[in-house]
Amino acid sequence: METQYGLAKGGSCLVSNMATALDEDIKLNYTIDRLCDNFADLDDEYEKIIWRNYINEVKKHINTKEPIAIFDDSDINKEYSKKLEDLDRVRDASSPDKRIVNGYNVCEAVLLSKNTNQPISVYSKIYSCKSKNFKSKNTYTLDSIKAVENIVGKKFIGIFDRGYDDKKIFDYMDKKEHSFIVRLEDTRTLLFKGKKKSVEEVAKSRKGKIAMKVLFDDNEEYELMLSYTKATLPYNKKEYTLVIVYGLSEDKPMKLLTNIKIESKEDVIRIVRLYLSRWRIEEHFRGKKQEYDFENMRVRTLKSMNNLNMMLTIHLGHIAILADKIDSKLLIIKIIYASKSLRSKTIVWLSQIARGMKEILKYAHEGIKRWQDIEVRDPRQLSLKL
């Protein structure tokens, strides 16, 4: 409860900001030390209970008719840190030159909500390749897929970026009979009518014959041309569909591989729209990093980082649940109005709601002590009996 309030009012992953937001009648250092100890010493069983309660709430708000799960990796840039546990070397994807810096990897999976397709995180793990118990990045990817399976309890559509162009992902999704759409690397080779060719070569030799228009969140409209063809993975000889998208980038067309059955041009357009919904997880990451200063967290152990990340994930999940009710709850309109955002319309409301809550809570000067059920013990004074 303290962490959730601290995140909402402080708007930051810095423990000092959360402690300041609690506004307790003790020295700030004492509050900071207590919060840091809570992150470091959180019992594993208690952690599971907290996460299970969150997932039980999430299940009420996801799209159960056609569950759509989006998987992606991110990073935490700790360029100037030296003393953190198992500090790794990662590629800073947000930098213009994609430089290698000190930091950590983050594996994330979100499910889309049932009303307005808000991204609700159901798996988020910070890890280092230098940890003793590290096996492989695919281990975390498969764990994230299994987490989605446990929640939806049936088949779902998985959306994956280029980093997941891997036969282990194809094999697992096929084995479990899940649908998938994976963006392919340019170096991927497939069999076309029995001949091995790179997808880049095939994309250059074809022309888009199916037109579609896409309006992004920045109100910029793109006219795309699509093409598709049957293709086979050389190692398993299974047939899939390669969808090629022209017009998103001036450099190269986008190549998507899917096991979803395509029978008409409407099916092709649907595949592309499903994949383009992947940007919602990008908005989720952006909200984490910009609104809550995610990369600036200053706890030293991976256990503390993951516990703080879990609390932030739960916080963002409840914001997504709020946003999913935007058409039926006046409270959410009031929160967004309080954010004083320049844009009155958007698709993912995470940033506006986060800023709105922070703006409203800045008028609270008592913290949350009076709402907490704290046991007050009677002072036991020793007395001398004559």
What positions do the PLM features span?
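Single, function-defining residue in the core of a domain
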Residues: 1-14, 50, 65, 82, ...
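Active-site-proximal, Lys/Arg-enriched surface segment
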Residues: 4-5, 34-116, 227-231
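Short alpha-helical "recognition helix" segments of helix-turn-helix
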Residues: 18
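Short acidic/histidine-centered micro-motifs embedded in hydrophobic/aromatic stretches
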Residues: 21, 38, 287, 291
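Short, basic interhelical loop/turn and adjoining N-cap
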Residues: 21-34
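A short structural micro-motif
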Residues: 24, 41-42, 294
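Amphipathic repeat-derived elements
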Residues: 31-38, 144, 278
